[in-house]
Amino acid sequence: MDLGIAGKWALVCGASKGLGFGCAQALVREGVNVVINARNADVLAQAAAKLIAASAEYASARGQKDSQPAVVAVAADITTPEGRAAVFAAAGGPGRDFDIVVTNAGGPPPGDFRDWDRDAWIKAVDANMLTPIELIKATVDGMAARGFGRVINITSSAVKAPIDVLGLSNGARSGLTGFVAGVARSKIASQGVTINNLLPGKFDTDRLATTVRAASEKSGKSVEEIRRTQ
């Protein structure tokens, strides 16, 4: 399948593993140049090596060995102004001129709402609502000016079917959903820019394992029992 996006530039957050890595890999296989971001430099470097190999395969299959998709890795905390600045200033990257942005911040810890203080809520909202908004704000006008842009926010199916132990995530991601619904319907829609949320269900990632353990501790059921009911 040719999606017609070869040569575009994409920013993929949380790309060292899991769904973020899967998105980056799929984009590279379509000939897209990627800037990948995560906090753990070692794990991100391993992901970059795999993506570079996929990039070489893409170029080789098309007889373009000297012109393969770029893979730029930036180890930084994207939830901070400094982290976002590092991504936009990355050597070999496009600056803020991304054609595709995949926001994918790690979810806040599961637990009981009675135990969450104001700081816990602020951290959740900052990472899972405000950070994607800041990335959209930094890139969307450039997309509109060029007549093409795609923003994908990886949130959670819990936005539509809330899970009690994921209250921090439910709240923050629902706020992002409301914001995106308005912006996606604004003038940019007629300028070739789309903004969508991806609400993944259950994938066997580290995040799911953490959620299952939390549900096990709260219910008194074994991890195996919880997994069987997923």
Regions found by a protein language model. Give the residues of each.
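Conserved glycine-rich Rossmann-like NAD(P)H-binding loop of the short-chain dehydrogenase/reductase
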Residues: 32-47
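Conserved NAD(P)H cofactor-binding loop of Rossmann-fold oxidoreductase domains
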Residues: 104-109
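Conserved glycine-rich cofactor-binding loop
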Residues: 9, 16-18
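Substrate-binding pocket helix/loop in short-chain dehydrogenase/reductase
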Residues: 112-114, 120-125, 151
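A short, exposed helix-loop element centered on a Lys and neighboring polar residues
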Residues: 136-137, 181
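The beta1-alpha1 cofactor-binding region of Rossmann-like NAD(H)/NADP(H)-dependent oxidoreductases
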Residues: 41-42, 75-86, 118
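Catalytic loop of short-chain dehydrogenase/reductase
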Residues: 150-175, 180-189, 201-203
